[in-house]
Amino acid sequence: MTVEIANIVGSGDLGVELDVEPLEADLSTPYSEYDPSNYHGLYVRLEENGPLITVYRSGKYIITGCASMESLHETNEEFLGMLADLGVTEEDTQTGFTVENVVCTAMLDELVSLNALAIGLGLEVTEYEPEQFPGLVYRPEEIGAVLLVFANGKMVITGAKDTETAESAYEYFQSKVQELV
């Protein structure tokens, strides 16, 4: 099985402080919500069931829920264009937009005992407390990602900054499992 993207998160900084309450009223999007008694961020969706943008008074924002890098960057560009049209920012505002986290899923080629895996991989790079969490957490220093491995063979790869890192993490882990089996 290949590694599949589950979620991509990116963030940027508009470089200006925002009054988010009137901003919510000015936005013409399918979904926006600002309830400071519940949370201090403004939630925005540019399309129904689309990626979620959380905007803060500081001008910082986070985009979550994208299934591809293309979707993440398109959502960012559309959001910035909308803010420029409202006069909130300049057309060419540099936000330093970066990918923060690529979350992927995959399946192990074969099932293994998580207890045996924790011991084989090394207790210094694994956490496995089945009474607290049903998965094994693997944090190898060699790769830029954290892997969650479950008894049914499903894996979640998180902390990567790009899909290549997630795929490399999967391949690295598969080779480690093969060494142990």
From Swiss-Prot:
Domain of life: Archaea
Keywords: DNA-binding, Plasmid, Repeat, Transcription, Transcription regulation
Function, in words: General factor that plays a role in the activation of archaeal genes transcribed by RNA polymerase. Binds specifically to the TATA box promoter element which lies close to the position of transcription initiation.
Gene Ontology MF annotations: DNA binding; DNA-binding transcription factor activity; general transcription initiation factor activity
Entry annotated with the keyword DNA-binding: yes
The protein, known as: TATA-box-binding protein C
A biological process from GO: DNA-templated transcription initiation
Record lineage: Archaea, Methanobacteriati, Methanobacteriota, Stenosarchaea group, Halobacteria
Sequence repeat extents: 5-83, 99-177
Coiled coil: none
InterPro entries xref list: TBP, TBP_archaea, TBP_dom_sf
Record family assignment: Belongs to the TBP family.
HAMAP family assigned to the protein according to its UniProt record, in alphabetical order: TATA_bind_prot_arch
Gene3D superfamilies per record: TATA-Binding Protein
